[in-house]
């Protein structure tokens, strides 16, 4: 949506009645910065309608844009949009294009490193900034080996990855969210996993 190069990945998004966005994943905002965008603004009120006489006093025809209690489960909510506003005011909208494009390109570069190795494999080709992969040069069950590797990686604190299940098997999962990352970082992670795999 923000990247000219990768806009085609969201073909058809204009047909959605609403979309959820996590600005902290690819759009340089601190965690947690999320939004639900509605094609028809009034749908936000219908989705989270609640009945609280002491809070919700707007007349039926009034548009209470300022009353977030009508659009969420929480009555008191941090103004998350201020984080996005600050980024746009400081850097302009084009910063989002640059970030999204760079992060997807970085994921493709990381996937290339995995493809070029003979001891890792991808679960599937990344379409955005998330990769699922696993170490394959392990004795015994690969799911157990990769779960042990993930635990060892996190315990040492140099890198942070999670694990996920895909087709009943355990895979390592990483989200690339820092556009300053480089192929050297990804190579270091793979080497680190190789080293830890010997100890697991």
Regions found by a protein language model. Give the residues of each.
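Active-site C-terminal subdomain of aminotransferase-like
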Residues: 2-5, 9-117
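A generic structural motif
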Residues: 25, 90-93, 137-139, 178-182
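Short, hydrophobic beta-strand segments
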Residues: 86-87, 132-135, 172-177
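Non-catalytic, mobile gating and regulatory segments of ester bond hydrolases
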Residues: 115, 120-121, 143, 189-192
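Short beta-strand
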Residues: 121-126, 161-165
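Conserved PLP-binding catalytic core of the aspartate aminotransferase-like
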Residues: 122-153
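PLP-dependent enzyme catalytic core of the Aspartate aminotransferase-like
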Residues: 166-200
């Amino acid at each position: 949506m923000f990247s000219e190069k990768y806009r085609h990945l969201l073909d058809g998004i204009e047909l959605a009645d609403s979309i959820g966005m996590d600005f902290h994943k690819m759009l340089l905002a601190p965690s947690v910065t999320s939004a639900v965008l509605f094609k028809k603004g009034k749908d936000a009120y219908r989705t989270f309608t609640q009945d609280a006489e002491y809070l919700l006093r707007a007349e039926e025809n009034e548009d209470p844009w300022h009353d977030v209690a009508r659009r969420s489960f929480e009555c008191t909510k941090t103004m998350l949009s201020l984080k996005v506003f600050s980024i746009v005011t400081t850097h302009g909208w084009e910063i989002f294009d640059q970030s999204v494009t760079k992060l997807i390109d970085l994921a493709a570069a990381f996937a290339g490193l995995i493809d070029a190795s003979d001891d890792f494999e991808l679960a599937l080709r990344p379409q955005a900034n998330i990769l699922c992969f696993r170490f394959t040069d392990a004795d015994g069950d690969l799911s157990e080996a990769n779960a042990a590797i993930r635990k060892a990686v996190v315990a040492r604190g140099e890198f942070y990855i999670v694990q996920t299940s895909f087709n009943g098997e355990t895979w390592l999962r990483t989200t690339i969210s820092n556009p300053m990352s480089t192929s050297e970082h990804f190579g270091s992670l793979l080497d680190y996993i190789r080293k830890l795999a010997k100890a697991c």
